[in-house]
A protein has these predicted regions:
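Short, well-structured alpha-helical patches and their helix-loop capping segments
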Residues: 92-103, 124-132
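Conserved acidic, metal-coordinating active-site core of Asp-based
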Residues: 127-191
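An N-terminally biased module of ancient metal coordination in phosphate/nucleic-acid-related enzymes
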Residues: 1-73, 157-158, 171, 177-218
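Generic hydrophobic/packing signal
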Residues: 64, 81-83, 115
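Short, glycine/charge-rich beta-strand/loop segments that flank catalytic centers
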Residues: 63-66, 121-127
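Active-site gating loops and adjacent loop-to-helix segments of metal-dependent hydrolytic enzymes
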Residues: 69-101, 119, 138-161
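Conserved phosphoryl-transfer catalytic core
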Residues: 98-123
Length: 218
């Protein structure tokens, strides 16, 4: 039998809209046999997802989407099939959590100055884990500042906009080395979504390969 895979999905543990349990149920409805939960810089949703996956006969692979900086750009590296309790992985994700929280607070301050009241508190109320820009976007929609998430990024949260805050994420080699140390494989996430020219994408792929990366999403 041909298996159906989904190796990159998010839950409410980061910026997804479904809980880990509901996400696995949705995957089952869609006929997915092998699923990887790859929340941003966290693995807190995996245990919950695993319980439901076992009930429904879905193979759940440990996953995470690690935020990195490369040449001044934010690049996401997916880790798959790793030991989520490995000391290097837990240390890296703890560092990322601290960086993400610091950025979230700074974004909240900028939104306050831009006339958005209680921005951090509002976004946090919508989050099940770390506060992300997606939660701020949803809050902006909720209070009527914008009509949809996309408009929130275009007006406030996207790169170069008034409330954008650049995070000092780890570099790509650190992400790759950590994933490998934990027994997993490292993959460039959505390479065509970084608004880069073909020349820059090729540079990214070459660097990633030289640093020991294993593959990329297509």
């Amino acid at each position: 039998m041909t298996k159906k895979y989904d190796l990159h999905c998010h839950s409410t543990a980061s910026d997804g809209v479904l809980t880990p349990t509901a996400l696995v149920q949705r995957a089952h409805e869609q006929g997915i046999n092998v699923l990887a939960l790859c929340d941003h810089d966290t693995v807190i949703g995996i245990d919950e997802a695993k319980l439901e996956a076992d009930k429904l006969g879905i193979e759940l692979i440990n996953g995470v989407e690690i935020s990195t900086n490369w040449e001044g750009r934010g690049i996401h590296i997916v880790g798959l099939n790793f030991d989520k309790t490995h000391p290097k992985m837990t240390a890296l994700l703890a560092e990322q959590k601290s960086l993400r929280e610091k950025r979230a607070v700074e974004i909240g301050h900028k939104l306050e100055k831009a006339g958005v009241p209680n921005a951090y508190e509002g976004a946090k109320a919508l989050a099940n884990g770390e506060v992300t820009r997606a939660h701020y976007a949803r809050y902006l929609v909720q209070i009527g500042k914008v009509s949809n998430d996309g408009q929130a990024f275009k007006r406030y949260l996207g790169g170069g906009k008034s409330c954008f805050v650049k995070a000092e994420w780890v570099d790509i080699p650190t992400a790759i080395d950590t994933i490998h140390a934990a027994g997993g494989v490292a993959v460039i996430a959505h390479p065509m979504r970084y608004n880069m020219t073909g020349k820059w994408i090729r540079r990214l792929i070459v660097d990633f390969k030289q640093w020991g990366g294993d593959g990329m999403e297509v």
